């Protein structure tokens, strides 16, 4: 199924995609290579389901990794399978010209939400991350996701990545973190021993919260300006008239709007 909301179908709002992750170009080339080589019996729906099953498997593996740390390596395999299902489904639908923009956008991001819930639930059960940190991170993630979906509907801006980080970069970062935790699950901070997942989880939660706040302020201002509820920035002042020998030259302000 497609995850591209830029297509318009039966009133489905067009949205401009913003994807600028570090791996965006390489990922696009890989997906365009994979799409024509995908067996005909595999559909976009199969890939979406594969992505969800992979996240459920990661959740179970995380829950068991507290007692069997080597399972973190299998979590990385699950993340790779999730990337394949979650990223290729839309590309395959567009390649085969069987897009369902509204259905794909809705189901794909609903699956993403359940996937995040499953993975963080597994981490909370593992003992590798405190339940409070996992819950707070999940709340911040959902807050940013809500802002993204609201902006897609009201402004027509669909932000897939934030700065150099998108879904693929987050998977890579999580895989590297799993490798670190496999050998060093705790780290000394301020003279105390803390779980690595907790330290980075708190930092990531703060970053997501700031991103959601900044995006919310920008979106609110953009909508207020569009609907006449907030004054635009004042135009630059016109330069003073300059007197030249043999004539008169008057300056005029330029508008960039």
Protein language model regions, located:
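Hydrophobic alpha-helical transmembrane segments
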Residues: 2-76, 122-257
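Acidic (Asp/Glu-rich) catalytic motifs at the cytosolic membrane interface
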Residues: 75-121, 147-151, 217-221
């Amino acid at each position: 199924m497609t995850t591209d909301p830029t297509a318009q179908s039966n009133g489905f709002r067009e949205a401009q995609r913003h994807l600028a992750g570090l791996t965006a170009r390489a990922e696009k080339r890989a997906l365009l290579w994979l799409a024509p080589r995908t067996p005909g019996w595999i559909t976009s729906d199969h890939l979406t389901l594969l992505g969800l099953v992979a996240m459920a498997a990661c959740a179970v593996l995380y829950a068991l990794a507290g007692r069997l740390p080597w399972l973190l390596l299998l979590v990385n395999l699950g993340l790779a399978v999730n990337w394949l299902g979650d990223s290729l489904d839309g590309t395959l639908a567009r390649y085969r010209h069987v897009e369902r923009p509204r259905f794909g956008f809705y189901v794909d991001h609903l699956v993403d939400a359940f996937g995040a819930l499953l993975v963080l639930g597994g981490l909370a059960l593992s003992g590798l991350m405190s339940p409070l940190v996992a819950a707070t991170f999940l709340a911040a993630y959902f807050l940013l996701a809500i802002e993204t979906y609201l902006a897609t509907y009201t402004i027509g801006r669909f932000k897939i990545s934030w700065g150099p980080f998108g879904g693929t970069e987050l998977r890579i970062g999580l895989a590297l973190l799993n490798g670190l935790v496999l050998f060093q699950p705790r780290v000394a901070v301020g003279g105390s021993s803390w779980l690595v997942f907790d330290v980075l989880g708190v930092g990531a939660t703060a970053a997501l919260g700031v991103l959601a706040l900044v995006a919310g302020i920008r979106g609110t201002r953009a909508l207020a300006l569009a609907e006449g509820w907030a004054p635009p920035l004042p135009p630059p002042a016109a330069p003073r008239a300059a007197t030249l020998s043999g004539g008169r030259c008057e300056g005029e302000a330029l508008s960039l709007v």
